[in-house]
């Protein structure tokens, strides 16, 4: 079995963005420096806006489903 060669760096230290000037071009530095990388996919809304505008489960259950079934049955009775 072949063994892997030892790595050159024994301790991994986080590299600062300014230290990587030779490695990264200006577009890479811009994309790493911007805060939009951290945000989540929330349709452009804040957590508060998303919580205020979501469909919450009804404590009564399937009220809309029962109502539409009742309305459709009444409509069928009136049609006959």
Curated annotation (Swiss-Prot):
Tissue: Strongly activated in pancreatic acinar cells during the acute phase of pancreatitis, in developing pancreas and during pancreatic regeneration.
Stated induction or repression of this protein's expression: Increased by methamphetamine. Up-regulated by cyclosporin A. Induced by energy nd amino acid deprivation.
Region (Disordered): 40-80
Basic and acidic residues bias spans: 61-80
Keywords attached to this entry: Cytoplasm, Nucleus
Post-translational modification: Phosphorylated. Phosphorylation promotes DNA-binding activity. Acetylated.
Main localization (coarse): nucleus
Keyword RNA-binding attributed: no
Domain of life: Eukaryota
Stored InterPro entries: NUPR1-like (IPR018792)
GO molecular function: acetyltransferase activator activity; chromatin binding; DNA binding; transcription coactivator activity
GO biological process, one term: male gonad development
Protein location: Nucleus; Cytoplasm; Cytoplasm, Perinuclear region
Keyword DNA damage listed: no
A GO cellular-component term linked to this record: nucleoplasm
Homology family: Belongs to the NUPR family.
Oligomeric and partner information: Monomer. Directly interacts with MSL1 and binds MORF4L1, two components of histone acetyltransferase complex; the interaction with MORF4L1 may be mediated by MSL1. Interacts with EP300; this interaction enhances the effect of EP300 on PAX2 transcription factor activity. Interacts with PAXIP1; this interaction prevents PAXIP1 inhibition of PAX2 transcription factor activity. Interacts with COPS5; this interaction allows COPS5-dependent CDKN1B nuclear to cytoplasm translocation. Interacts with RNF2. Interacts with FOXO3; this interaction represses FOXO3 transactivation.
Protein name in UniProt: Nuclear protein 1
Organism encoding this protein: Rattus norvegicus
Lineage, top ranks: Eukaryota, Metazoa, Chordata, Craniata, Vertebrata
Gene, per the UniProt record: Nupr1
């Amino acid at each position: 079995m072949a063994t892997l060669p030892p790595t050159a760096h024994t301790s991994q230290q986080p590299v600062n963005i300014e230290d990587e000037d030779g490695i990264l071009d200006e577009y890479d530095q811009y994309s790493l420096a911007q805060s939009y990388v951290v945000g989540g996919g929330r349709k452009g809304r804040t957590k508060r806006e998303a919580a205020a505008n979501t469909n919450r489960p009804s404590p009564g259950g399937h009220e809309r489903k029962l109502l539409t079934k009742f309305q459709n049955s009444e409509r069928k009775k009136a049609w006959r």
